[in-house]
């Protein structure tokens, strides 16, 4: 523990906050290419086949990203835009794919919360 004198001379160093989405490098979105598209199962009490993609970003980092919504058209070599935001029941998944941008199509027949899934307004 420092003495009062040491604190007067040096002071306390403020703690740096660690980023929850380090691969984004302070950007709101990042572009990347799918290297693998697959399904995975969530942690205990939940049960499902969650759609995820391994993505090589423009800063040459590899991240696992969740594909939201029902059905998708992604495959290997698809170019996607990702945003931060983890999926609580999938360990290691800290990013989301943006729907309706670049090679990702919006969710078909989506009526509510359309902007989050890149769906156009139904006629």
Curated annotation (Swiss-Prot):
The modification 3-methylthioaspartic acid is found at residue 89. PROSITE patterns: RIBOSOMAL_S12. One of its GO terms (biological process) is translation. It comes from the Bacteria. Part of the 30S ribosomal subunit. Contacts proteins S8 and S17. May interact with IF1 in the 30S initiation complex. This is Small ribosomal subunit protein uS12. Residues 1-29 are annotated as: Disordered. Coiled coil: none annotated. Belongs to the universal ribosomal protein uS12 family. Keywords: Methylation, Ribonucleoprotein, Ribosomal protein, RNA-binding, rRNA-binding, tRNA-binding. The keyword Transmembrane does not apply. With S4 and S5 plays an important role in translational accuracy. One of its GO terms (cellular component) is small ribosomal subunit. InterPro entries: NA-bd_OB-fold (IPR012340), Ribosomal_uS12 (IPR006032), Ribosomal_uS12_bac (IPR005679). GO terms for molecular function: rRNA binding; structural constituent of ribosome; tRNA binding.
């Amino acid at each position: 523990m420092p003495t009062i004198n040491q604190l007067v001379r040096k002071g306390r160093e403020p703690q740096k906050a660690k980023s929850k989405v380090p691969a984004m490098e302070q950007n709101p979105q990042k572009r990347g290419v799918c290297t693998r598209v697959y399904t995975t199962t969530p942690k205990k009490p939940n049960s499902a086949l969650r759609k995820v993609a391994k993505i090589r970003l423009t800063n040459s980092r590899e991240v696992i990203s969740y594909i939201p919504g029902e059905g998708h058209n992604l495959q290997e070599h698809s170019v996607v835009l990702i945003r931060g935001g983890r999926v609580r029941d999938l360990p290691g998944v800290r990013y989301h794919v943006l729907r309706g941008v670049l090679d990702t199509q919006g969710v078909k027949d989506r009526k509510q919360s359309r902007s989050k899934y890149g769906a156009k307004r139904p006629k």
